[in-house]
């Protein structure tokens, strides 16, 4: 798999069997736009737009609780957006400017499109991603 994200650090873990249970994209984004990752409305908008872009049907509204207030590195919003075929989850560290996002679905989706959209939405300077086909 090639990707359009410049300087992306990628790992691709492919199944050896022909049947797949699901597809999981795990992204660690660094040096994100701090205004975006610390804005609950923007994080919710990301989840809704991502669902549209990768053709996933959301199940309910995104949930965006604020967690980790006791530790500076973990303080920030978390995200869970259930989709009919699984979920989109994330955590956003305001102090480090990092975002950690997983997209898991039993329905195949365009991984590069999801990665590029996520990177652009959060304005990350650097991204490390892993893609796993689950058996």
Q: Residue spans of the language-model regions?
A:
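Polybasic/polar functional segments that serve as interface/processing modules
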Residues: 1-135
């Amino acid at each position: 798999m090639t990707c359009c994200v410049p300087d992306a650090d990628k790992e691709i873990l492919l199944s050896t069997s022909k049947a797949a249970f699901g597809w999981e994209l795990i992204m660690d984004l660094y040096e994100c736009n701090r205004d975006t990752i610390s804005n609950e409305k923007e994080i919710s908008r990301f989840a809704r737009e991502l669902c549209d872009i990768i053709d996933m049907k959301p199940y309910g509204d995104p949930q965006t609780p604020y967690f980790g207030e006791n530790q500076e590195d973990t303080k920030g919003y978390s995200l869970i957006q259930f989709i009919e075929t699984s979920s989109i989850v994330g955590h956003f560290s305001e102090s480090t400017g990092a975002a950690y996002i997983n997209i898991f679905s039993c329905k195949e989706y365009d991984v590069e499109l999801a990665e590029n959209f996520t990177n652009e939405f959060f304005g990350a300077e650097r991204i490390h991603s892993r893609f796993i086909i689950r058996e």
